[in-house]
């Protein structure tokens, strides 16, 4: 009888314990503003500082998924063409790392809508090019944000000096509002899976990064093949390949006689490598991970068989 009397109390304690554990798990699944900011600073393809992200709102959509809206400070490089039209050329994704905006829009499949190169009205004082209005319009057109809008806030427009540049260039620092979808990866914490701006659709960042790397890989292979052809021309005239263990030395010898364009860095903005002996050579790129001697290295060797 005593054992039977204890059983309901025992079961009750188990049920209470389980409910408490579920409650604790639910608390741990909550996404704080700090966690959201950390995830956004390290979203795929980006390395941002904490000060570059201002989280405006966070909401859970399930125990392991959430959405967050934030303002992100981005740095863009604008270029002016021969017809005096401005375009967004690059976006800075990490310290000393830039991505080609045309390449990103091609991978994402985005198109720009607004015409932003109409002449600005006359103004007094120092003229800033592009004007804040034009910069905001170009960014809004790129990101699917109808200008004017608080979703695009220009912080600074400043000249961007590039030695021997053929086109005028300007740096634009802007705060862009983004919507993000996040997933709880357990021990890895919260991670951004998708991003949306303005009226654009949701974009999977890992898919975009993979698409960018695929295009860059094709570009790297084409560039290495071009250098390899120059080395074959060199051997045809000199009787051997260029003997060197530095890519910069090889390019200095090949350009411009055998190579019309000096190709020094790969699409990930890392120096190509060269190892050359009289009878053979190896050209390589460290690939997407920017590390030598790893599985994603891109290698072209000669002579071709």
Locate each region found by the language model.
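Low-complexity, acidic interaction segments enriched in glycine
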Residues: 165-167, 175-184, 189-209, 217-305
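Low-complexity, intrinsically disordered terminal/linker segments enriched in charged
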Residues: 30-47, 59-62, 67-73, 90-186, ...
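Bacterial Sec-dependent signal peptides at the C-terminal "C-region" and cleavage site
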Residues: 22-31
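N-terminal secretory signal peptides that target proteins for export/translocation
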Residues: 1-10
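Extracytoplasmic
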Residues: 50-53, 73, 278
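Short, basic/low-complexity N-terminal boundary segments at the transition from targeting/disordered tails
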Residues: 37-48, 53-54, 137-144, 239-259
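Bacterial N-terminal signal peptides
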Residues: 14-23
């Amino acid at each position: 009888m005593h054992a039977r009397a204890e059983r309901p109390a025992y079961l009750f304690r188990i049920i209470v314990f389980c409910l408490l554990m579920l409650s604790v798990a639910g608390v741990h699944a909550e996404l704080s503003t700090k966690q959201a900011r950390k995830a956004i600073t390290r979203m795929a393809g980006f390395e941002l500082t904490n000060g570059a992200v201002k989280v405006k709102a966070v909401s859970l959509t399930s125990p392991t998924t959430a959405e967050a809206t934030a303002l992100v400070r981005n740095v863009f490089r604008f270029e002016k063409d021969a017809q005096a039209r401005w375009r967004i050329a690059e976006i800075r994704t990490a310290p000393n790392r830039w991505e080609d905006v045309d390449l990103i829009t091609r991978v994402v499949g985005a198109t720009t809508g607004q015409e932003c190169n109409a002449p600005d009205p006359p103004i007094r004082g120092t003229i800033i090019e592009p004007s804040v209005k034009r910069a905001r319009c170009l960014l809004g057109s790129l990101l699917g944000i109808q200008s004017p809008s608080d979703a695009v806030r220009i912080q600074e427009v400043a000249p961007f000096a590039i030695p021997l540049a053929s086109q005028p260039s300007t740096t634009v620092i802007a705060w862009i509002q983004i919507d993000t979808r996040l997933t709880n990866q357990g021990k890895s914490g919260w991670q951004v899976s998708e991003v949306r701006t303005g009226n654009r659709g949701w974009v999977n960042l890992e898919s975009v990064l993979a698409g960018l790397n695929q295009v860059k890989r094709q570009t790297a292979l084409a560039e290495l093949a071009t250098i390899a052809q120059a080395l074959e021309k060199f051997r045809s005239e000199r009787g051997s390949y260029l003997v060197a263990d530095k890519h910069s030395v090889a390019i200095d010898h090949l350009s411009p006689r055998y190579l019309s364009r000096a190709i020094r860095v790969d699409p990930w903005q890392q120096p190509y490598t060269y190892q050359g002996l009289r009878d053979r050579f190896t050209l390589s790129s460290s690939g997407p991970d920017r590390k030598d001697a790893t599985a994603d290295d891109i290698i072209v060797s000669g002579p071709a068989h």
